[in-house]
């Protein structure tokens, strides 16, 4: 009798457990981002200015390049101000310079990015919908007296290349916040 009760309980447990299913929640491709950083954030200083020559943007539509440049500058400025850093003019002898680069995969390959930046996150495009394109954003911090950056971060994600520039502001803010999360508050 006890064996029959144990078998019944075991059978019920097996039915209950086998009825349970799990779903892996994968982020949508549009939200997938990979990042790689290199350098020493302890060298970050209180005042900064924008690098005079490192601000390149490579897109399919050259008319979007200046608005995208300005969007990224604004987003980085917001993050840096929230962390207590002060932007100054280049002529006011900033303690550090911030530069950036941005490119779509159709305009610059991972091999080219690696050659220029020395970093590449290697986000795979296998099986990605053709309406999305891989984009890369590099942010680098420099000592004004040294040519090479002392800290840099490179992020890759997917973007809808047909999306208007004005609809990308929130995405730039979120990306800048994520990319600069390692920068300590001043």
Residues of each region from the PLM?
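Bacterial N-terminal signal peptides that target proteins for export
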Residues: 1-9
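C-terminal motif of bacterial Sec signal peptides marking the signal peptidase cleavage site
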Residues: 16-19
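C-terminal/domain-edge helix-coil "capping" segments
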Residues: 21-39, 129-136, 141-186
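Compositionally biased P/S/T/G-rich terminal and signal peptide-adjacent segments
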Residues: 28-56
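A short, structured loop/turn motif at beta-sheet edges
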Residues: 38-46, 87-94, 141-148
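Extracytoplasmic/periplasmic, Sec-exported soluble proteins
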Residues: 42, 60-72, 90, 129-133, ...
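N-terminal segment of the mature soluble domain
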Residues: 47-105
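Surface-exposed short loop/turn segments
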Residues: 93-150, 156
């Amino acid at each position: 009798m006890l064996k029959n009760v144990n078998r019944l309980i075991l059978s019920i447990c097996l039915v209950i457990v086998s009825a349970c299913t799990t779903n892996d929640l994968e982020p949508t491709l549009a939200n997938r981002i990979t990042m790689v950083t290199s350098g020493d954030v302890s060298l970050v200083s209180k005042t900064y200015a924008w690098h005079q020559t490192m601000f390149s943007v490579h897109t399919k539509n050259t008319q979007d390049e200046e608005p995208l440049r300005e969007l990224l500058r604004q987003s980085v400025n917001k993050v840096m101000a929230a962390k207590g850093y002060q932007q100054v003019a280049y002529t006011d002898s900033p303690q550090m310079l911030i530069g950036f680069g941005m490119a779509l995969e159709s305009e610059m390959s991972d091999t080219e990015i690696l050659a220029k930046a020395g970093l590449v996150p290697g986000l795979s495009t296998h099986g990605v919908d053709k309406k999305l394109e891989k984009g890369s954003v590099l942010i680098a911090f420099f000592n004004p007296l040294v040519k090479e950056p002392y800290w840099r971060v490179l992020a890759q994600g997917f973007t809808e290349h047909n999306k208007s520039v004005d609809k990308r502001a929130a995405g730039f803010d979120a990306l800048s916040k994520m990319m600069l999360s390692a920068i300590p508050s001043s």
